[in-house]
């Protein structure tokens, strides 16, 4: 028997079947670095329209986690896709380098600043620590395959950036938005500093819940205010609080003007509460609610004088809209030091702050009874005092949501302190910010509503901190009036120039006389530092507007959905305060990573996924594919099992690509390409299918629908190509003469499809796309990442063999396959090439299928096809899912060709090749087979 293997065009490619991503990717990264890939891209896109994705800086502390990986991969996908669309899309990564966590870590090593080590040395150690953290995180981000200007990132601790942060502050001062105030702010007694809204998170906390009686001082006055007051005994207004430690600072009781209040008789006493809360107060405090002896509205009691429960202080009743019937008694004890609503309602009545609590959470020495006590430890002492004064109605433990420091995880207090604020009301800043929201595209669109709701409750932004490691608030204030120096804008620029040369120490070491001259005697340097949210919030000024490769405003900000209250908001407020315009055109948010059960990831639970581990075991491309395949608009589930499924999907895509590549063996596109109009009809369809799909894919990249791209590519590879096209052309590619038009047509189509596919996957499977690009035949003008979307020819809709035609053919093929499988299972046939198929088709379908002539058998992967009219179908013909079609399958009695394995009547008709069919004889030594359709 003759071996005809050498006459076949067997597949061959250097593109490996086994990815070995974990081993191969680091080598690829070295090559990218050696080739200076990022700069190659910049040079290739020089002068093109820009697309700026501005990187929200991660905090320089700790290894990268899965949330970091998601964020950076999404950004990288967008930047690479925009580059493929022809944009110049520089990507400058950044890091947030100041703040409390770095101070805490440095304190553990060198001790407290100003105690164990001087401030300058402490700042130096903080800078060294942050630099080390940046280096570690950078290594992790590079390993993900993220292409960025890693040699020139922005760090908020760079001298130039620190100087520009100070300049940004100067512009905000010059525009009249900075104020100094004595206001309650979130205060960390552990950190000894104020916190911004964005640094606050809510956790469950168990507190004392107490109902306290404030006695009415002048019962005659009360009697006149309450219509038809009855009953007997002293009258008290009942307040409810979960922060007993604030009672020493209590200066008023707030009621709601429109609420109805009732007086209820108790044994020997009368109590006033909101009628809507009477039942719940009764159940909680165990009081008798049966006998109502008086009614009034809140407004009737305005300025009624009450007695503080343990001080001699008189306490007025005031009115406030913040009083509701959600919980409590409808009467709210009011301490302007310890709550923004309390502060605001107190201000309207001329009630100021007392400043009883110091920065460490201790009552000051001047505070009666509680001097030196810590606010966290004083509740029981206060409760005992209330009991001794017969002012405690009820006490119990109460678990509720309470503000905590997001870094130290410790409870916060509201504390009135002298601070610097960006005023949201002065000069109408908040109104302008709200208007600017309209001009931004929010993706998903609920982001706009979230931002608006955040802004509705937006107080003045406290930007000052009492820290060592932070950009200084480089201002001079008058020692007596506390007013800013009249030449502040010019002074800020002088200080910024010094900081640009010597860093923030230039301010801390500065002798005011060097800048102020004789004025120095009247002015003090501000010693506060800036909130780190200000540092990152002004990067639109300190980075985008300072680097020539960027442009303002940015096209896109992309971060987690928690940043509506964080970076998105701080950036918007500062940009409006400085420039009057939003810093971004689009804001895109992604959800948080959760485990397979939807639970938040936690080291203590043990359900975290380490990106380093995934990359070391499965490769970065698998991690990137998981990110792309997941709808990131909501929570993103990840687990070892999910990643293993992703790895399987990756292998299927890789195998399809490899099959394409192996069929390009011996193909030189410069020499062997076939013009689109000269291609075999099925090949034209395959290229047309890719062209139409590419339009969808580019649109999905533009709308950030990456999970849809994954689905479309996966479907294209597995269904359109693997399940239809590649099955059909296998015979043509393997058995026809190497340089025949029909074979070169199939190779041309596959070459174009791979050229398109490699671009489609490059933003997502970057390492794999690079590997494919290296193995592709033909000349290349540069790396895949400098390429643009491939221009693909398309079929005209009036082409008889258009997309609709081949969809019909695919349905017929699927229907025939089901019948073949049934006959194979019942033993009628072996493989499909051992079958002869008779199709009984309606007139319309008959005409369509008949247009393929003899080549219909190659579409159906059988040795012979007979095409007949539907009304000729015998009763035992198989009914199939295609309308107007019945199928009959019989075993072929013809001999099997030793080369193509088709069973044909003409096998043995050639004396020199008795084992071959006629077309194989022609392909081996004749003029070769001719194909037009399949």
Curated annotation (Swiss-Prot):
PROSITE patterns: AA_TRNA_LIGASE_I
Organism: Teredinibacter turnerae (strain ATCC 39867 / T7901)
CDD domains per the UniProt record, alphabetical: Anticodon_Ia_Ile_BEm, IleRS_core
Binding site for ATP: 603
Top-rank lineage group of the source organism: Bacteria
Name of the protein this chain belongs to: Isoleucine--tRNA ligase
Protein family (similarity comment): Belongs to the class-I aminoacyl-tRNA synthetase family. IleS type 1 subfamily.
The keyword Aminoacyl-tRNA synthetase is annotated on this UniProt entry: yes
Record note on cofactor: Binds 1 zinc ion per subunit.
Protein localization: Cytoplasm
Motif ('HIGH' region): 58-68
SUBUNIT field: Monomer.
Gene Ontology CC annotations of this record: cytosol
Cofactor: Zn(2+)
Domains as described in the record: IleRS has two distinct active sites: one for aminoacylation and one for editing. The misactivated valine is translocated from the active site to the editing site, which sterically excludes the correctly activated isoleucine. The single editing site contains two valyl binding pockets, one specific for each substrate (Val-AMP or Val-tRNA(Ile)).
InterPro entries from the UniProt entry: aa-tRNA-synth_I_CS, aa-tRNA-synth_Ia, Anticodon_Ile_BEm, Ile-tRNA-ligase, Ile-tRNA-ligase_type1, Ile-tRNA_ligase, M/V/L/I-tRNA-synth_anticd-bd, Rossmann-like_a/b/a_fold
Sites where the protein binds L-isoleucyl-5'-AMP: 559
Example GO BP: isoleucyl-tRNA aminoacylation
Amino-acid positions noted as binding Zn(2+) in the UniProt annotation, renumbered to this chain: 897, 900, 917, 920
């Amino acid at each position: 028997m003759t071996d005809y293997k050498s006459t076949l065009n067997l597949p061959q490619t250097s593109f490996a079947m086994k990815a070995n991503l974990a081993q191969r990717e680091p080598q690829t990264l070295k090559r990218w670095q050696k080739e200076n890939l990022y700069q190659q891209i910049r040079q290739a896109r020089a002068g093109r329209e820009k697309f700026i994705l501005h990187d929200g800086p991660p905090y320089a502390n700790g290894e990268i986690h899965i949330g970091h990986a998601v964020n950076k991969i999404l950004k990288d996908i967008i930047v690479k896709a925009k580059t493929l669309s022809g944009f110049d899309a520089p990507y400058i990564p950044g890091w947030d380098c100041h703040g409390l966590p770095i101070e805490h870590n440095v304190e553990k090593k060198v001790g407290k600043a100003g105690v164990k080590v001087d401030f300058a040395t402490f700042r130096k150690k903080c800078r060294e620590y942050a630099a080390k953290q940046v280096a570690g995180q950078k290594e992790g981000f590079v390993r993900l395959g993220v292409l960025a200007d890693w040699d020139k990132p922005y760090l908020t601790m760079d001298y130039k950036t620190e100087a520009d942060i100070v300049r940004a502050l100067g512009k905000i001062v010059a525009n009249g938005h900075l104020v100094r105030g004595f206001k309650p702010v979130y205060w960390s007694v552990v950190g000894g500093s104020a916190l911004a809204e964005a640094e606050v998170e809510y956790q469950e906390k168990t507190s004392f819940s107490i109902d306290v009686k404030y006695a009415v001082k002048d019962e005659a006055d009360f009697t006149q205010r309450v219509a038809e007051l009855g009953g007997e005994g002293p009258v008290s207004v009942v307040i409810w609080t979960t922060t007993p430690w604030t009672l020493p600072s209590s200066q008023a009781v707030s009621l709601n003007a429109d609420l109805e209040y009732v007086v209820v008789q108790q044994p020997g006493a009368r109590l006033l509460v909101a009628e809507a809360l009477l039942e719940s107060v009764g159940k909680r405090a165990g009081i008798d609610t049966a006998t109502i002896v008086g009614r009034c509205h809140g407004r009737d009691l305005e300025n009624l004088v009450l007695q503080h429960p343990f001080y001699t202080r008189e306490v007025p009743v005031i009115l406030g809209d913040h009083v509701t019937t959600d919980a409590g008694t409808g009467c709210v004890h009011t301490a302007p030091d310890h709550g923004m609503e309390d502060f605001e309602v107190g201000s309207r009545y001329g009630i100021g702050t007392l400043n009883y609590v110091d920065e460490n959470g201790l009552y000051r020495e001047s505070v009666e009874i509680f001097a030196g006590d810590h606010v966290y430890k004083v509740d029981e002492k206060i409760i005992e005092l209330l009991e001794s004064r017969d002012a405690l109605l009820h006490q119990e433990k109460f678990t509720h949501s309470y503000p905590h420091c997001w870094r130290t995880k410790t409870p916060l207090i509201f504390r009135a302190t002298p601070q610097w604020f960006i005023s949201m009301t002065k000069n109408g800043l908040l109104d302008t910010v709200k208007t600017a929201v309209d001009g931004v595209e929010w993706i998903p669109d609920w982001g706009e509503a979230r931002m608006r709701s955040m802004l509705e409750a937006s107080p003045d932004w406290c930007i000052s901190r009492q820290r060592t490691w932070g950009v200084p608030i480089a201002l001079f204030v008058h020692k007596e009036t506390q007013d800013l120096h009249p030449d502040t804008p010019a002074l800020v620029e002088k200080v910024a120039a010094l900081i640009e040369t010597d860093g923030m120490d230039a301010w801390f070491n500065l002798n005011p006389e060097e800048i102020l001259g004789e004025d120095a005697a009247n002015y003090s340097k501000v010693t506060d530092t800036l909130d780190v949210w200000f540092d990152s919030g002004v990067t639109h000024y300190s980075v985008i507007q300072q680097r020539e490769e960027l442009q303002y405003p940015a096209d896109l900000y992309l971060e987690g959905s928690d940043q509506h209250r964080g970076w998105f908001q701080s950036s918007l407020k500062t940009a409006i305060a400085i420039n009057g315009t939003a810093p971004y055109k689009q804001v895109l948010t992604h959800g948080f990573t959760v485990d397979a059960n939807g639970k938040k990831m936690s080291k203590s639970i043990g359900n975290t996924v380490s990106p380093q581990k995934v990359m070391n075991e499965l490769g970065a491309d698998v991690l990137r594919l998981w990110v792309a395949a997941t709808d990131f608009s909501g929570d993103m589930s990840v687990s070892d099992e999910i990643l293993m499924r992703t790895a399987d999907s990756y292998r299927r895509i890789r195998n399809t690509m490899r099959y394409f590549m192996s069929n390009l063996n011996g193909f030189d596109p410069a020499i062997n390409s076939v013009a689109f109009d000269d291609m075999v009809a099925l090949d034209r369809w395959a290229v047309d299918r890719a062209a139409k799909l590419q339009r969808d894919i580019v649109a999905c990249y533009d709308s950030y629908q990456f999970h849809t791209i994954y689905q479309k590519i996966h479907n294209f590879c597995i269904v359109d190509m693997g399940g239809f096209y590649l099955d059909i052309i296998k015979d043509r590619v393997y058995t026809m003469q190497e340089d025949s038009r029909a074979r070169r047509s199939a190779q041309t189509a596959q070459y174009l499809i791979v050229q398109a596919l490699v671009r489609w996957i490059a933003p997502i499977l970057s390492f794999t796309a690079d590997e494919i690009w290296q193995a592709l035949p033909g000349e290349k003008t540069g790396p895949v990442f400098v390429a643009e979307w491939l221009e693909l020819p398309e079929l005209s809709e009036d082409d008889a063999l258009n997309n609709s035609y081949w969809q019909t053919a695919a349905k017929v093929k699927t229907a025939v396959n089901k019948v073949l499988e049934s006959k194979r299972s019942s033993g009628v046939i072996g493989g499909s090439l051992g079958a002869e198929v008779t199709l009984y088709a309606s007139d319309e379908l008959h005409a369509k299928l008949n247009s393929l002539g003899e080549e219909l058998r190659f579409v159906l992967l059988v040795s012979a096809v007979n095409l007949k009219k539907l009304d000729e179908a015998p009763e035992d013909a198989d009914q199939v899912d295609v309308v107007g079609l019945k199928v009959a399958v019989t075993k072929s009695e013809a001999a099997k060709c030793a080369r193509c394995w088709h069973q044909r009547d003409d096998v043995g008709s050639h004396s020199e090749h008795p084992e071959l069919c006629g077309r194989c004889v022609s392909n081996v030594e004749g003029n070769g087979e001719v194909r037009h359709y399949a």
